[in-house]
Amino acid sequence: MTWIVAGLIAGVGAFFADYVMWGKVFTGPEMHGFGTMPPTPDERKKMMLPAMLKSGALALVFGLLLACSYERLKGGLWVQGGGPLAGMEFATLLWLCTIALSTLGSGVWYDKVRPLLKATFWSWLVRMNVAGLIVGLLVK
């Protein structure tokens, strides 16, 4: 399968992983101070459609970029021959040197947003590994 199709499928997987993490896991009272939800249900419905479309488009772009990068760099991974484990290794390496260090470093100085940074830390790890697993399975 081409990396473009694999990237689009990985983007859909990342979108659903992101939805589960932010819609079902990180919903406690400590997170309520970081989001602005309109007060009425009708206004919430109006806001949700554009927000979900934007999130979906960004997830597709993310999947394409991840698949393209994986296609070009998979030969340098510890897991040789591709596959789901290679995709997850690639995704975790990207996550570790970018998002993990950024959120840990920001948490040192911005202590009031530490709950949001922790949520970002874990949600991106899940999102990256879901997309990496899909890309590793589909790109040969």
Where are the language model's segments positioned?
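Juxtamembrane/disordered regions of integral membrane proteins
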Residues: 1-140
